[in-house]
Amino acid sequence: MLVLSPSKSTQKLEFINTIQLLGVSYHFEHEIEESLSEIYNGYEEWIGESHNLHAVALSFRLLRQQGYYVSSDVFRKFTDDQGNYNKELVNDTHGLLSLYEAAHFRVHDEEILDEAINFTTTHFKLLLPKLSNSLSMQVSYALKYPINKTIARAATRKYISFYQEEKSSCDQVLINFAKLDFNILQKMYKREMCDITRWWKELDLANELGFARDRVVELYFWSLGVYFEPQYKVARNILTKVLCFVSITDDIYDTYGTLHELTLLTNAIERRNIDAIENLTSYMKLFFTALLHFYDEVEKELEKENKSFRVNFAISEMKKLVRAYFQEAKWYHGNTVPKMEEEYMKNGIQSSANPTLATASWLGMGDEATKEAFEWISTEPPILVASSNIARLLNDIVSHEREIERGDVASSIECYMNEYGATKEEAYMEIRKIIENNWKDLNRGCLKPTTVPRVLLMPVLNLTRVAEFVYKDEDAYTFSKNNLKDVIFMVLDDPIEE
């Protein structure tokens, strides 16, 4: 299909963009890489001639999205001598939307893209009431969930409905294919969910540990945000189970365990020995036994493919996570407000759970996940630190008020206010800046050349996207009966009418 598309660069880019947004690009990964590589090689020549904002912004985004570094200077042709975007651009809604989406792939020292986000966001808010209903919905969705900061399946479900509205440009064959593909995958996800739910019920931890959040469906959706493609069925299964254990661990350390109990559990997990069970309380014995059994089962399965070495890396990250949770518990019980950078943020890399989840996300992946790759991710490379910082801080912002009422450990908000004498609003503003700076680091880490194959970096990026989605305006994981419930229903349970 892709090979038959017109050879002109802009038309090719439009087609690639459409199949990506419709969620079917995973069928054409090789063809897309070939096409974008060809476009990248001749990029400087043809882009210099183009004064079409949509074409320039679209090419910039798709190339960066694929890992190709292209200069943001290409947008200078759309600015005046002071570096401000030309006012007449506001009449080009599609161009403006493309610029907005492209700017979210910015790295450090790209003020022109910082300005692009300010410019497009400001003007879209003014333009919204004047746009057609269909375009207004599309822009509103983009303002809340830009392409680089959303869950692919949720965006696909929305975009299919947007695309159908564009009667003049809608390719009927393509839209029918996208709907069919979405529904086929949805049926597969339902079967996967049945397997996970059966495992969860047999484990019975939700009943035995009544204080813990029972969110197996939400956690499956979380793993689906990391990889939705059919070939990652085993990886999704393992990651969802790890997410279940991480969620329970968080609740034990955050809300239920006494410091003495947590000391014993931390030591038991460090030792990873069933003999350590003797000193634990009854509910911790159940949890600890289930955790050991889970990793043993994964190890046996991976041994069949000579990949059992991966489990030791996953367990090592789980131990680091438990240490980080335990450190937070000690701060809480000691009424300590840690230093923002050298204490809270350093510990927060692990307490975000992203290093544990990123490593676990590779357990069921293909041969690209080598021992060297696992060794690399265990060193906390910059891309993982950025991802973890974003997840940690987003969680802190949306849970801050609730945790103050509950008397939880000091979050980054309190740490910043305490250290810099800032107001709550100033702390929020600064922390949002820190989040955006970490996104720039993350975007940089996804550009070629990369230390490990890009297929391994995608789960790290997608874990961050899930955090952006789940912690957008609220803690949608803890309070999942709100907006998240509707999104999960659309993705997992509501087929598209073909």
UniProtKB/Swiss-Prot annotation:
Which UniProt keywords are listed?
Magnesium, Metal-binding
What GO annotations for molecular function exist for this entry? Answer: magnesium ion binding; terpene synthase activity
Cited SUPFAM superfamilies: Terpenoid cyclases/Protein prenyltransferases, Terpenoid synthases
Residues binding Mg(2+) 2: 250, 254
Q: Which InterPro entries match?
A: Isoprenoid_synthase_dom_sf, Terpene_cyclase-like_1_C, Terpene_cyclase_plant_C1, Terpene_synth_N, Terpene_synth_N_sf, Terpene_synthase-like, Terpene_synthase_metal-bd, Terpenoid_cyclase/PrenylTrfase
Report motif location: DDXXD motif.
Answer: 250-254
Amino acids binding Mg(2+) 1: 250, 254
Cofactor dependence: Mg(2+); Mn(2+)
One BP term from GO: diterpenoid biosynthetic process
According to the record, cofactor stoichiometry and binding are noted as: Binds 3 Mg(2+) or Mn(2+) ions per subunit.
The pathway noted for it is: Secondary metabolite biosynthesis; terpenoid biosynthesis
Positions binding Mg(2+) 3 in this chain are 403
Family classification: Belongs to the terpene synthase family. Tpsa subfamily.
What does the domain comment read?
The Asp-Asp-Xaa-Xaa-Asp/Glu (DDXXD/E) motif is important for the catalytic activity, presumably through binding to Mg(2+).
Quote the function comment for this protein: Sesquiterpene synthase involved in the biosynthesis of volatile compounds. No activity detected with geranyl diphosphate (GPP) and farnesyl diphosphate (FPP) as substrates.
PANTHER family attached here? OS04G0344100 PROTEIN-RELATED (PTHR31225), SESQUITERPENE SYNTHASE 15 (PTHR31225:SF76)
What is the name attached to this protein's record?
Sesquiterpene synthase 15a
User: From what organism does this protein derive?
Assistant: Solanum habrochaites
Q: Which gene encodes it?
A: TPS15a
